[in-house]
Regions:
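Short acidic, hydrophobic short linear motifs in intrinsically disordered regions
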Residues: 39-64
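C-terminal accessory region of radical SAM enzymes
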Residues: 314-348, 378-425
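Cysteine-cluster motifs in flexible loop/terminal segments that predominantly coordinate metals
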Residues: 405-456
Length: 467
């Protein structure tokens, strides 16, 4: 499968199944397109030869021109790449998908909902102000301890285990967070495990003690900020209706500075009111000094005033291109920023099974409520039909777990002809469920956004050769 596009002056050809990315000249670009359309080799050669003058007219003055022998030479190079498995490669992944129901159920990560309550009242919150459409509550140390034991017991021989302190607002239960980290450290050697903790916070509860603890114990922190003050404060208000920007920004800056500017993400949400989200990213970078950035489209039902419209998406796609070009400029000038969704590894990358199955929700990754219930991920919490079991009895809804085992790109017919399927791995099961009522469905707007991100990320990789 081949995907071709032009962006920022680059002719980019992606060979889906090999993962090879080629930056080519105009004649080669057209030759690949014609061959991909099923045109015979000789017809392609004649077509290229008949258009040499047109190709030459596109070449800037002073640069080498095409000659009569170039069409044949280009076709030979394409044939060499094809023989090497770097163009028109075969799908080696689909046969692996049939093994998924038989795969082991090693649990690698937990999302610990230490607080089903929050000190902000964000109107766009998918978690209903941290309560997940249920009652408020804080996780006890005993429940959290059992969750960590459950993770160890079900992690097999895996050494590194991931735990995210989540909510609600986890710092509303900071003492328990501290106790759980201390407990985890106390059992690492005995079980040959290493816990890697992440803290996701709105920043209200950050203190000097929190900063010292997080920078010592958490290998990553996720800091929620939507960007410009007026954008952030539209939705991210406290319980009295006051915007949070002025309170949280100095705390975030202090934490990041103490952290050495590493291993964190500023995580924002853009909505119908700010589809021009690059202005928010650039505000965080240029005015506030943050360099590790992420920005997500809002999760909202159609008709919600915050929900993105089809018209918004066109603006959003333009914004992704603006961001990619600006990141190249910053890299050239020696002041780079990182955007989470443009981080792509073309030399190593995930294993075969990861490329097919994605995040592992419901199998390798689960969310734990304050009361110890298990769900496939945080976006399913509160939906009783998606309860997997609990941390005392383990996974008891085996049929549901088996459904999530089969969550892979080949289980979704709509993904069959998508060039980006081995980058998204079939996409988010929760987004699919909320959009279609089926975890094997497809969230089409999300697909469009994802494909644009990948195109921009690959273009940045192409540009890096010229830096």
């Amino acid at each position: 499968m081949i995907h071709q596009y032009r962006l920022n002056g680059y002719n980019i050809v992606l060979d889906t199944f090999s993962g090879s990315v080629h930056v080519v000249d105009d004649m080669s670009y057209d030759a690949i397109a014609l061959l991909d359309a099923g045109k015979p080799r000789e017809e392609v050669r004649r077509t290229l030869s008949a258009n040499i003058d047109r190709y030459n007219s596109l070449i800037p003055a002073g640069e080498e021109r095409y000659t009569e022998g170039d069409p044949e030479q280009i076709l030979r190079e394409i044939e060499e790449l094809t023989k090497a498995g770097k163009l028109f490669s075969k799908d080696i992944y689909e046969p692996k998908a049939f093994d998924f129901k038989k795969r082991s159920t090693v649990v690698k990560a937990l999302c610990l909902h230490v607080a089903h309550t929050c000190n902000l009242n964000c109107s766009y919150c998918f978690a209903a102000q941290g309560k997940f459409h249920g009652k408020a509550g804080l996780m006890s140390f005993e429940t959290g301890k059992r969750a960590l034991d459950f993770l160890v017991e079900n992690s097999g021989t895996r050494h590194n285990l991931e735990v995210d302190f989540f909510g609600g607002e986890p710092l509303m239960n900071f003492d328990v967070c501290k106790q759980l980290v201390a407990y985890a450290r106390s059992i690492e050697k005995e079980h040959d495990k290493h816990f890697r903790f992440t803290l996701t916070t709105n920043g209200i509860g950050i203190t000097d003690e929190v900063i010292e603890w997080a920078n010592r114990e958490c290998y990553n922190v996720v800091l929620s900020l939507d960007g410009r003050k007026e954008v952030n404060d539209r939705f991210r208000k406290d319980i009295n209706g006051k915007g949070s920007y002025d309170t949280i920004v100095p705390k975030f800056q202090k934490l990041v500075k103490a952290r050495g500017g590493k291993n964190y993400y500023m995580r924002g949400t853009f909505t119908h009111y700010n589809p021009d989200f690059t202005k928010d990213l650039f505000h965080m970078a240029d005015d506030l000094g943050f360099t590790q950035l992420s920005m997500e489209p809002v999760v909202a039902k159609p008709g919600d005033p915050a929900a993105l419209t089809k018209e918004d998406l066109e603006i959003v796609f333009q914004q992704y291109e603006i961001l990619a070009k600006d990141m190249i400029r910053r890299e050239k000038e020696g002041h780079p920023i990182t955007f989470y969704h443009y981080m792509i590894d073309l030399t190593g990358g995930p294993c075969v099974y990861k490329r097919i199955s994605g995040c592992g929700s419901g199998t390798e990754y689960m969310a734990v409520t304050p009361w110890g219930d298990l769900y496939p991920c945080h976006q399913f919490v509160g939906d009783e039909s998606y309860k997997l079991g609990d941390i005392w009895h383990g996974v008891t809804n085996i049929a549901l777990r088996d459904e999530f085992k089969l969550c892979n790109v080949y289980a979704r017919p709509d993904c069959k002809d998508c060039w980006a399927k081995l980058y998204c791995s079939g996409g988010c099961a929760a987004n699919a469920y909320h959009a279609t009522g089926d975890i094997h469905g497809v969230y089409r707007d999300g697909c469009e956004v994802f494909r644009k991100r990948i195109e921009c990320a690959l273009m940045i990789k192409a540009a890096e050769r010229d830096l």
